[in-house]
Amino acid sequence: MVEYWKRNFFMVLVLQAFYLANCLTDEEIPEEWLLLHVLQGQIGAGNYSYLRLNHEGTIILQVQSLKGDADIYVSSLTLNPTFDDYELQSTTCGLDKITIAHHLSRPVGIGIYGHPSHMESEFELKVYYDRTVREDPFADASYDPEVLEAKQRQQQQQTSLDSSQEEESVLRTILIGVLKIVLELLF
């Protein structure tokens, strides 16, 4: 019986070791992401550390809490975002990740907050640039004079064809109406 419990206890320890090893390994970074900057820092409980992002394009921020719990808040409206005033946030324990879209106005304020559950938090911030080219959803709606002119000509031809058919229809209706009146008068 003791051997049974020893074996089970050993299995639990092995499983915990595998789980811990998986948690500590870095997440795979796509090839399209270019590492721009790495910053390590410390933040006291309930305090903020502020950064400013001027780089254009799609930016990915990864904050890894090395000790304690550091959360991240982002805003294009204020350079000092807080947990009350932000546009993007990530407040998980461990790895926090935020994607700042390319259309968000720059500069962007970044606030790293030391959660009060720990007296001091250590963090590592990695800033990535996403090089993937995304199609502009409004590209088809943009102004191209040649395409616009061709569409206008096509619409004019269509409206002239429609108007000639409409004129024929009106003439037929009038002619049929006159014939009905004449036939009523005669009979």
UniProtKB/Swiss-Prot annotation:
Family: Belongs to the UPF0669 family.
PANTHER family per record: UPF0669 PROTEIN C6ORF120
Protein name: UPF0669 protein C6orf120 homolog
Signal peptide: 1-23
Keyword Glycoprotein in annotation: yes
Keyword annotations: Glycoprotein, Secreted, Signal
InterPro entries tied to this protein: UPF0669
One annotated Gene Ontology cellular component of this protein: extracellular region
Glycosylation sites: N47
Bilayer-crossing regions: none
Organism: Xenopus tropicalis (Western clawed frog)
Subcellular location: Secreted
Domain of life where this protein originates: Eukaryota
A Pfam family of this chain: UPF0669
Broad class of where this protein is predominantly found: secreted
